[in-house]
């Protein structure tokens, strides 16, 4: 009888131990989360904030705390952007945070006109302070390191696109990546076209920025680029309305009036011949390619169509252009656009 009792006790103990082992295994190495969760750990975050954001989504919180203490996570977690996937275990989550196994984020740069806008756009998508990024963009030293003369010229290095970065990328890392993208863009057969056009990279980018602000119609961009190339070659001021808006920093200006044309600025192409000192926006790749493959014609004027369809009427003579301009102005008046 005693032997049977002892045997039962041993079996019960074995079952309990096995159950405990299985439970422990499941808690540490089993599925700890039921849905995907993105975790952003900033450089300023403390361990408590990290754990507090994770705990509500964890099935095995005690196991997480125990394993995190065992690995010293409190003193050594890495900042970054982490994606906690369904099916991940406590062990995998803790190790991910300790080793800094980040998931890159997608950073989109588009429709940017000024360094201030660019720094704000970057700061919204990466763990970078706006003021710190703007300081880098305005640094003459950084401009020279990137191969440019001035911070204004440095702005021509940035190309609109979507890039992958680690969320914790520093301003310096961001700049080096953008320089590589810039060199890659131009080395893809575009430098050869530059030589044929007689423009430098900076000049082509600056002209492309004007073309981009004039139209979003990619099929019309080469023709508009051709107008400006003709004006440059003939020594005629570009008289580009978007440069007035940039000079005045009034990007919502809907109608350029005579009083605006005298605004004192090196970016005002009504009072200054040639190109502005630097781009007036971040032009699209299509606008850059339109400058490199500009349409050869003899137009030197263009004016928005009164149909407001985004396209333009082109002219070879001032009288033709004035007729187009009067038709457009009449439509502006009819629509009460001032």
Summary of predicted features, one role per range:
Residues 237-238, 272, 277:
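Mature, solvent-exposed C-terminal subdomains and processed small-chain segments of exported/organellar
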Residues 250-257:
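Short acidic/His-enriched helical or mixed secondary-structure segments at domain edges of catalytic enzymes
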Residues 1-239, 244-249, 265, 281-286, ...:
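Conserved catalytic or metal-liganding residues and their short signature motifs at active sites
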Residues 260-272:
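His/Glu-based metal-binding/catalytic segments typifying zinc-dependent metallopeptidases
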Residues 302:
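Active-site-proximal loop/helix segment associated with metal-binding centers of metalloenzymes
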């Amino acid at each position: 009888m005693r032997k049977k009792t002892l045997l039962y006790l041993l079996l019960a103990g074995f079952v309990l131990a096995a159950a405990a082992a299985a439970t422990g295994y499941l808690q540490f190495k089993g599925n700890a989360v039921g849905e995907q969760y993105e975790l952003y750990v900033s450089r300023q975050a403390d361990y408590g904030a990290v754990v507090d954001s994770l705990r509500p989504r964890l099935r095995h919180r005690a196991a997480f705390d125990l394993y995190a203490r065992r690995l010293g996570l409190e003193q050594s977690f890495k900042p970054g952007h982490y994606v906690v996937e369904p099916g991940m275990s406590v062990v995998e989550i803790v190790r991910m945070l300790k080793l800094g196994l980040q998931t890159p984020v997608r950073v989109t740069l588009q429709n940017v006109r000024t360094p201030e806008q660019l720094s704000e756009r970057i700061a919204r998508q990466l763990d970078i302070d706006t003021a710190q990024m703007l300081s880098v963009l305005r640094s003459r030293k950084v401009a020279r390191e990137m191969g440019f003369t001035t911070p204004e010229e440095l702005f021509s290095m940035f190309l609109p696109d979507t890039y992958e970065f680690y969320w914790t990328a520093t301003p310096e890392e961001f700049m080096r990546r953008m320089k590589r993208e810039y060199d890659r863009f131009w080395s893809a057969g575009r430098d050869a076209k530059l030589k044929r056009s007689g423009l430098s990279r900076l000049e082509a980018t600056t002209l492309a920025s004007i073309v981009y602000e004039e139209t979003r119609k990619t099929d019309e961009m080469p023709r508009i680029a051709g107008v400006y190339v003709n004006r440059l070659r003939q020594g005629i001021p570009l008289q580009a309305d978007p440069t007035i808006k940039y000079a005045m920093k009034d990007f919502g200006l809907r109608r350029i009036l005579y009083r605006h044309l005298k605004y004192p600025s090196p970016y005002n192409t009504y009072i200054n011949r040639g190109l502005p000192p630097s781009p007036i926006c971040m032009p699209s790749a299509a606008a850059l390619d339109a400058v490199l493959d500009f349409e050869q014609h003899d137009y030197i004027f263009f004016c928005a169509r009164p149909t407001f369809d985004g396209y333009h009427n082109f002219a070879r003579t001032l009288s033709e252009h004035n007729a187009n301009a009067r038709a457009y102005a009449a439509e502006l008046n009819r629509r009460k656009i001032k």
